[in-house]
Each structure stands twice: as structure tokens, then as C-alpha cells.
């Protein structure tokens, strides 16, 4: 099924139409999207573990039988037990190991299906609205712009483009949604949480620096698209802007 969507210029005016690649007709499998997101997120965990010397920094002496006390290692001249898991301040019986393999496997076909399903959901108005994104009524998704937007080098010009396209309201939603997270994470370098807004997919993603400082905006190239950017939190339907060159690159995707 060839679906046509409008192409917008740098000024936000419609300049033509383009056929969407077959990847946008992929069967949507939200369960596989969640599974792939979980596998990728868990695989990014940082290994952690306790010190090999934890609980073993005291010298303990084992007593002989016949003294009426248990034969556990104790400090010299005292009765305090040290160096075993059941002792106060002793070592952990089965502490975390930094050598543990935290990688979570997922089938290649499932990983590809998750990515293609997430791309297909970017063209669903219902899925994008359900995710909470805000945009102009009657806007046809996905949004495709000409390659000239890669030459935008000022943030004020980027804001003007997003306003002309009718998606700047989603940037405001992300800015207003920034809040201090609950729990200990606020003390560990991740104090704030902020909703994701627009994803911009461009063939030359490194050239689109003008969009980087906008709240919740992510930039990616067609080759670096990941389920973490297409479906944050494992929920597909992210509001996405593709450049004309990025759409052409997606036509080469092997279904």
C-alpha cells in the first residue's frame, strides 16, 4: 500500500508529496516492542559489586573446643565474632559480582520486528496522541521535510520551523513536564525527569545542532534508529519528523 504524505519546506509550506516506504506498513506488535525495549535497557546496566575485602578486614581467631562457646572466628582478647556472613559487620554470603554477565539476549528477528513496528507507529495519529504528544489537528503523519532543514544552524530558526509545522506545542509540553524525580535517584546525578517530545530523523544528523537544546528533542540518523528513541519506555507512537533523505534511506530497509 503506497501512502502519500506531504513534504514541507524550510519555511513550513507544503512543496509536494512523497510515497512512504513499505516499512511503514509493517504489522504492529506492541508486545515485541516492549520486549525489545526491556532487553536493550537491561543490557545497558553498569556492572556493580562489593569489595572483595568487605567484611574481611578484621583478624579472627578460632577457639578450641571445650570452652562452652561456639567455635567461630573472634577478635583477640574479646568475644566479638568477625569474618563470617552471620556476624555483625561480616562479609555478605552471596554479594553481587562485577563479573556477572548482564546482557539480555533477544532474537534478531524480534529486534528487527520491534524497530519496524515502532517506525510504523510513527505514522499512526491515534498511537501518537495516545502517547501524549500534542500537535496541530489535521496534521498528516509522519511529518516529512525537505533536506534543506539540515542547514538550519540557529535555534530560533528551528523553533520557527516547528511552529510552522504545528508541533511546537509538544516542545512546550516537554518543558512544562520537567520535574524532580522521586527516590534516591535525585541524589545520584539524575535529579530531573523530562518527557520526550519530537524525534528528528535526518541522513546527516550531526548537522542538526540547532534542535539539540530544545526540551525533549532527540536527533538520529536512519542507520542509528533504536527502539529507545522510537519507543521511549517501550511505548510506540513517538511524534517524528523525517527528512526527505531519511525517507529514501528507509526504502532500502530489508523487510
Swiss-Prot record:
It comes from the Archaea. Keywords: Ribonucleoprotein, Ribosomal protein, RNA-binding, rRNA-binding. GO terms for molecular function: rRNA binding; structural constituent of ribosome. InterPro entries: Ribosomal_uL4 (IPR002136), Ribosomal_uL4_dom_sf (IPR023574), Ribosomal_uL4_euk/arc_CS (IPR013000), Ribosomal_uL4_euk/arch (IPR045240), Ribosomall_uL4-arc (IPR019970). The keyword tRNA-binding does not apply. GO terms for cellular component: ribonucleoprotein complex; ribosome. GO terms for biological process: translation. The keyword Ribonucleoprotein applies. Part of the 50S ribosomal subunit. One of the primary rRNA binding proteins, this protein initially binds near the 5'-end of the 23S rRNA. It is important during the early stages of 50S assembly. It makes multiple contacts with different domains of the 23S rRNA in the assembled 50S subunit and ribosome. This is Large ribosomal subunit protein uL4. The lineage of its organism: Archaea, Methanobacteriati, Thermoplasmatota, Thermoplasmata, Thermoplasmatales.
Amino acid at each position: 500500500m503506497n501512502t502519500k504524505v506531504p513534504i514541507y519546506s524550510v519555511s513550513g509550506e507544503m512543496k509536494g508529496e512523497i510515497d512512504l516506504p513499505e516499512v511503514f506498513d509493517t504489522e504492529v506488535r506492541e508486545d515485541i516492542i516492549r520486549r525489545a525495549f526491556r532487553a536493550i535497557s537491561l543490557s545497558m546496566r553498569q556492572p556493580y559489586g562489593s569489595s572483595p575485602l568487605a567484611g574481611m578486614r578484621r583478624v579472627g581467631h578460632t577457639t578450641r573446643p571445650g570452652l562452652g562457646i561456639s567455635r567461630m572466628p573472634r577478635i583477640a582478647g574479646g568475644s566479638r565474632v568477625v569474618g563470617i556472613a552471620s556476624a555483625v559487620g561480616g562479609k555478605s554470603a552471596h554479594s553481587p559480582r562485577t563479573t556477572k554477565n548482564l546482557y539480555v539476549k533477544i532474537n534478531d528477528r524480534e529486534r528487527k520486528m520491534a524497530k519496524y513496528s515502532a517506525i510504523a507507529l510513527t505514522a499512526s495519529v491515534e498511537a501518537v496522541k495516545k502517547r501524549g504528544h500534542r500537535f496541530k489537528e489535521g496534521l498528516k503523519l509522519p511529518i516529512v521535510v525537505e533536506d534543506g532543514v539540515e542547514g538550519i544552524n540557529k535555534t530560533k530558526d528551528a523553533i520557527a520551523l516547528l511552529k510552522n509545522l504545528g508541533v511546537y506545542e509538544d516542545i512546550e509540553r516537554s518543558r512544562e513536564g520537567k520535574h524532580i524525580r522521586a527516590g534516591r535517584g535525585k541524589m545520584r546525578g539524575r535529579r530531573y525527569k523530562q518527557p520526550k517530545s519530537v524525534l528528528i530523523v535526518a541522513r546527516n544528523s550531526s548537522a542538526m545542532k540547532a534542535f539539540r537544546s530544545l526540551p525533549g528533542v532527540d536527533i538520529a540518523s536512519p542507520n542509528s534508529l533504536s527502539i529507545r528513541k522510537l519507543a521511549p519506555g517501550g511505548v510506540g507512537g513517538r511524534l517524528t519528523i523525517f527528512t526527505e533523505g531519511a525517507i529514501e534511506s528507509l526504502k532500502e530497509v530489508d523487510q
